[in-house]
């Protein structure tokens, strides 16, 4: 403990040291960023953040570079109002994304504006392990129900991942390699079991832009399941490959065509369950995406088409304790997405966005417990939608829209939203903006929930409603404050009901309405342009379905540049108590909640640039205080680990 306190003192001292330093160049850089800040996909088109009444958080390229060596889910877990269950578990274990107390099925993932899902999954939610952080330029998180523009799954929020663009040079490239430890708090090791390398080649040849990327990751070091014995279980492994090719051609200033080809794959071993080892379970997942995006600008607006096909194959083998053999599961799914969008500007203050979205999903499953025929397990949707944006000259911005969801299985469903932003004060001394929104959303039943042996073809979509109200404010050049209150209602949730006769269970819509209220607040204090600290707090109060959702989460970050080209950042998180309903008494008394205690994590990142920024050395320490805790009952989490790497631009 004394050693841990000394480490904390050292970190704080380092931050205070940075308060004595100041860089005019950095100050000008930051000021320009604030002036030019835009939200790229809040309305599917560029829009200044001050003109939207939605809560939006952006992870910039600077944030990504500052956290070199991390994964997408590790960065998202630092965002206020987001909790990723399993983020610090063995990489082979599935992750769950909770936004404002919701579940993964209620958080829609986009890549360059294209919605992604897993048609083979029980809830059809996308696996964020399939994308490498090194591919990404920035990430935007749009909070609240957002189905009007984005369709099914946008119940609690939208995570829009924007991939890197090509350099204006003829040829540019980046090569990065990193090595790190991977161990639990009880079984520390100096072995370098966390390995990654990636390379990117991009550039511009006349009117053609190109960007090619390839990434390899390997990970081992500890078992997924937690051992109750003094001897740990055998190690579980994880390896992944990611590659993409992106091309863009500008015919003229009005017409542009983009195309992409993307392949992601990972292999993993996994255990038999909580506190239960296995040396035979293994899995594989592959994703192949291809798409085009023609875009035309005209005098009063622009129009584009997003057309993509996503093919996903999953398979795994698991030990069957009853038969003494292994069960094999094979899942194959395909999703087709066509989104035709037009923006027309009637005046500089008023624009109308119209679109029509077509999607088709199908699933084929082969297993010892029954098959799913793709000729049966498929559905399609045709959704027309409209959204209007009006920006007044006195600081008020209004955004309102609606969508008609036409589903081949359950019929029609209507959603709508409206949001307001009102800039009360805006000058060099103080800015104050009020925001408010009321929006609805839907989550369509998955192919598995509809067409498996446990499925019910009469399922209705889950509906979500969000109301939120808050403010953004800046006081001088040092203080920035924001806070928002939200209330969500969930109805028609798809649940699994046990039955006394075969097949002993079936999916159905719940009669219960789930009420969720919460507060998100953060404050940023710019002590100097070289030392910035941000403290955030999220509170979630949910009436039911609360497994693993913390009621309280506190975050604090410190960013310091003590000397030129050196950046040091720390991130502190305190995750409050969580509960798990133990229906069968597996971990205690049947029918009672198991309480997981709160825990705190402190991470540190260091970056140093040389050769005019062409070479970047980076390092990190995660869980610096080596805290032992459980994210999921019966499974290990990472202890104190170290990583170091180098990035070379050419």
Whereabouts are the PLM-identified features?
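Structural signature of Gram-negative outer-membrane beta-barrels, strongest in the C-terminal barrel
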Residues: 252, 347-353, 357-363, 369-490, ...
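Outer-membrane beta-barrel signature, preferentially recognizing the C-terminal barrel domain
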Residues: 276-297, 331, 433, 437-491, ...
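Gram-negative outer-membrane beta-barrel transporters
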Residues: 176, 391-398, 485-489, 509-583, ...
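N-terminal periplasmic accessory domains that precede
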Residues: 37, 72-75, 95-98, 107-110, ...
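Short acidic/polar hinge/loop motifs at secondary-structure boundaries
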Residues: 115-143
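Extracytoplasmic beta-strand/coil segments of soluble accessory domains associated
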Residues: 73, 77-115
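Conserved C-terminal beta-signal and adjacent last beta-strands/turns
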Residues: 8-12, 23, 90, 202-205, ...
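Flexible loop and strand-edge segments within Gram-negative outer membrane beta-barrel domains
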Residues: 25, 219-225, 229-244, 248-335
